[in-house]
Swiss-Prot record:
Protein name: Acetate kinase
Cofactor(s) for this UniProt protein: Mg(2+); Mn(2+)
Domain of life: Bacteria
Chain sites annotated for binding substrate: R98
NCBIfam families assigned to the protein according to its UniProt record, in alphabetical order: ackA
Keywords from the named record: ATP-binding, Cytoplasm, Kinase, Magnesium, Metal-binding, Nucleotide-binding, Transferase
PANTHER family per the UniProt record, alphabetical: ACETATE KINASE (PTHR21060), ACETATE KINASE-RELATED (PTHR21060:SF15)
Catalytic activity: acetate + ATP = acetyl phosphate + ADP
SS bonds (residue pairs): none
Amino acid sequence: MKILILNAGSSSQKSCLYDFKEKNFLDNPVEPIWKADIDWTLATGQGILTVKANGIKQKITLNSDDHHHGIAKMLGTLVEGKTKVIQHLSDISIVGHRVVHGGTDYSEATLITPDVKATIARLIPLAPTHNPSHLEGIEAIEQVLGNIPQVAVFDTAFHSQMPLEASVYPIPYEWLDKGIRRYGFHGTSHKYCAEKASQLLNKPLTHLKLITCHLGNGCSLAAIKNGISIDTTMGFTPLEGLMMGTRSGSIDPAILIYLMREYDFTFEQLNEMLNQESGLKGVSGISADLRAIFEAINQGNDRAQLALDMYLHRLRSQIGSMLASLGGLDALIFTAGIGENAAIVREKACQGFSFLGLKLDLEKNANSPVNIDISTPDSTVRILVIHTQEDWAIAQECCHWLNK
C-alpha cells in the first residue's frame, strides 16, 4: 500500500510517499521512500523543487509560480529519473492532506468530496494563508490522479470536543453564530504525541492527564484528559497563546485599537506586525530562530536575553493554565523543533513546577533525548521528549479510512 501525503503552506508544498509492507506498520513508524519540497519564496515567478529518494537529493528549478504546475512536476519525479520509486502514479492507493482549518464541521479525518472542498473554501477567511493552498493541492491531485481517494486531516479536529467554557470567548454571545470561537491548532501533532506517550508510559490513553508542548516556529499547548483535548492555547487563529518565533501570541486587544486610533495603523499593517514581526524576532530584533538568540545572548545582547526570558515566562504561565484545566498531571511532553532540541527550554520550563514534585534528569535532558522519559525516578510527573511525526499520523488516518 502506497500513501501520498501533501502538506501545503502559503509559500511551500511538502510531500512524501509511504510504502506500507508490514501488517504491524501502524505501531512502527517508517521513513518515507520519497520526499519532496517546493519553495516558492526564493524568486518571483519561479520555485525550487527539492526531491530526496533512492539515496540522492535533486534540485529542480520551476520556471513558474503556478502551484498546479509545480505539484504536477513534483509528482512526475515519483515515476521518472533518478528519484523514481514507483512504476505508475496509479500505484498510489490514497492521498492524505493536512488541512489547517476545518471549523466545527469535522472532528475526524474525512474523505474529500465537493462538499468538503466547499467547506475548506468557506473557511478561507479564518485561514487565509493556508486553506487556499490546501485547495490547490487537492485540485492538482484531481487533475493528475483523477478520482483517487483523498482524505483531509484537519488541524482543528482534535480540539473539536473542547468544552464550551474553553472554546467560547467572553464576548457578545451572538458572535458565536459568526464562527468566532476558539478552534485550536497543531491537533495532528498533539494527538500523535498523546498516543505515543501512552505507548512509552505503557498506560491506556483513557487513563492519562497530559500536557503536550508543541514548540516550533509556531507554538501551542494542549491539555489532554483521557485522550480528549479539553483546552489549548491557540484559539480563533494560530496567533493566540504562547509567544512564538514571529507571532506575538496573546496580547491586550486594546493595543490594536490604540494603534489604529492614535497612529493610523491599517489592519493589514497590524496583521503583518503581529504575525511576521513579533515574538522572538520582534523583541530580540535579531531572529525567530532560538539558535541565533542563544548566540546573541552569549555575546551579551540584552534584547536577546529579554526575548528568551519572556518566551520562558509565557511558556511556564500557559503550562500552569493547562495544568489547572486538567486538575492533575501524569506527563509533560515536549515536541517539535524547539521542544525536541532546546534542552535549556525544557530545563527552565520544568523548573517552574518543581513544587509539584516534577523533577528533570539534567543528564538525560542534555543528551539529545528522543522518545524517552527524561524525568528522575522519584519524579511525581513523567517528562517526555517525543519526535512528532505529523505526516506519519496523516498516513495512519488514511489507512484507517481505507480499512473502514
